[in-house]
Amino acid sequence: MTTLFDVLSNGYKDKKKKSKQLGDYVLDESLSNHNHQTYYNPKDKKLLFNVTGTHNSHDWLTNIKLGLGIGYKESDRYKQSHKALRDAKQKYGINNATLTAHSQGGLTANYISSKGDNVVTLDKATTIGGKSRENSKDYRTNGDIVSLLASTRHNTINLSNPNKQTGNIIYDTLQAHDIKNIKNEKLFV
C-alpha cells in the first residue's frame, strides 16, 4: 500500500529524484509535471492523481487570487491539473480516481474532482464560505493556519502537531504546515 506521505513528498521532488513507482502505482510521466502527478495501478486498474501544493513564485500569485476569491479557476495551475486528470481518466478508461493533495493543491483537487472520486488532502487551503465535497477526507495538522477555516468541518480529521512549540509564531506555523508531520502516520491511499 502507498501512504499519503509518500505520494505528497514525491510530488515536491524534482523530476530526476521522483520515484517512478509507489507501491503498485506507476508514475505516468506523460500526464505529470511539477504541479501534478498521475499514477496508474495496472494490477488493480486504479488511478491516483496528486496535486502538489505551493512550490514556486507563480503559485504565490495563485495563492493571492485564491485568498481574494477571484480568478483561481482561470489560473494555468488549475487548468493544467483539471485537463491532466480528465486525460488520465480517458487514457485508462477510469471514471473514479483517488486524488491526493497538500495545501493549495488540496483546494485544486477539491475543485477538479468528480462526484465518484475520492479526495484525500493534508492541510488543504480553505476559503471563507468554501465547501468540501462529501467524498473528501481532509487531514489537518493542529496549528496549521492554511487549513484553519476547515478545522470544524465534518470531513476534517485534526491531527496532533508533532513539533515542539518554540514560541516563534512564524516558525511554529511553518512547521505545522510541513508534510513531514505525517511521515510516521499510517495514512494509506
Where are the language model's segments positioned?
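Serine hydrolase/lipase
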Residues: 43-46, 94, 113-189
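A conserved cap/lid and substrate-binding interface adjacent to the catalytic center
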Residues: 9-98, 118-120, 125, 130-134, ...
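Gly/Ala-rich beta-loop-alpha elbow adjacent to hydrolase catalytic centers
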Residues: 100-105, 109
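Generic recognition of flexible, low-complexity loop/linker segments
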Residues: 36, 109-110
